[in-house]
Amino acid sequence: MFLRRILLALGFAGVIAAGAVWFQVSSSAVPAQGGDLALPGLSAPVTVLRDGLGIPYIFAQNTPDLLRAQGFVTAQHRLFQMELFRATWQGRLAASIGEAGLASDIRMRVLGIEQNSRRHTQQLSADSRAWLQPYVDGVNAYIDAHTGDHPLELGVVGLDARPWELADLVALIHFVHYTHATNFKAEMLAQQLADHLGAERAAELMPLMRNRSSARATDGEQGSPGGDIAAAPPATGAAHGLGSVRLLFAPEPPRNGGIGSNNWAISAARSASGHAMLANDPHLDNRILPGMFHPVGLFAPGIQAVGATLPGLPGLLLGRTEHVAFGVTNAYGDVQDVYVETLDPENPEHYLEGGRSLPFRRNEQLISVKDGDAPGGMRE
């Protein structure tokens, strides 16, 4: 996964920088975990207790205060991780880590996670906004009022803690969906096999389904990681398009179609304790520190829950209440589609659609790349 390589690059940069900044570590501020802290916007006092592992348990008198405090505490623990994720989906990594982040920046700009998330945010219901906004306010309260507590890693890597918006929470969901559902790479491979070998021979190497717009899958053909394929298009345009996409996504090889995550439920009749049990294994890389999930306990009237969520998302993604346990299982299903446009041979600035020649919409963006040899240490 490209995130792993980015984190490794950041880790290498951090090791180099450590020799220059080691003396700051012992004196750098650590988030306050005792005493009273001011959190603007609370309607009643909130208590945060931490166990021996540092896991926070938040006790509030109402749900908005609970979510506001969760945002605050999450920023205390994982602000660097949150800012790293945001810089990744916004395509701003190269400005901090140089050439190592450029491929990721190009990929994110092409996918348009940031723009799509802002459009999605405009469609949020009032209930969704009421759930998300207190969390955002809590994150920003920590960023604004506790600048001295910000993680040392932010300065080492060159990232700034910026105010968060509702769109950032939506973008995180889009980003996680992208990183955990990558069958589009298998679709590109399937299309290339079909173009070079023909659909029948390609199907012997990789399960695939015919394009539903031209023919339904016949008996014996199954949906698969390869997804739908189109009939071999003209060489002009389509091959160029696939080649361009391949260049953008070459660092990410297709996943093995046999992997996935799992949940295991044990009935009370079969457990040693006499109680039902749920074991959840989301299959996330445990070599990445901090981990993808942030463990937390949430307690308010009507809410008694412990579990974990992604840093940047309120509530819980997996965990348990006094009534039920729930988990996350990734099936790596066919949830992404790749569309290959055919260039107009008479005008490469146009593409063909239904016999018509239509102009491409251009969206030119500049990507800043950290470069010690460039004026001001940055090039575009």
Mark where each language-model region is.
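N-terminal Sec-pathway targeting helices
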Residues: 1-15
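Substrate-recognition/specificity elements adjacent to catalytic centers across diverse enzyme folds
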Residues: 5, 19-277, 282, 289, ...
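Hydrophobic cores of alpha-helical transmembrane segments in multi-pass integral membrane proteins
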Residues: 13-21, 317
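Short helix/loop capping segments that flank catalytic or ligand/cofactor-binding pockets
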Residues: 59, 67-69, 274-275, 286-290, ...
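Ser/Thr- (and often Asn-) enriched beta-sheet segments in non-cytosolic proteins
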Residues: 153, 207, 364-368, 379-380
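Short secondary-structure boundary/capping segments
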Residues: 157, 167-178, 292-297, 332-335, ...
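Residues that flank catalytic or metal-binding motifs in active/ligand-binding sites
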Residues: 260-262, 273, 292-294, 313, ...
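Compact, glycine/acidic-enriched structural inserts
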Residues: 301-377
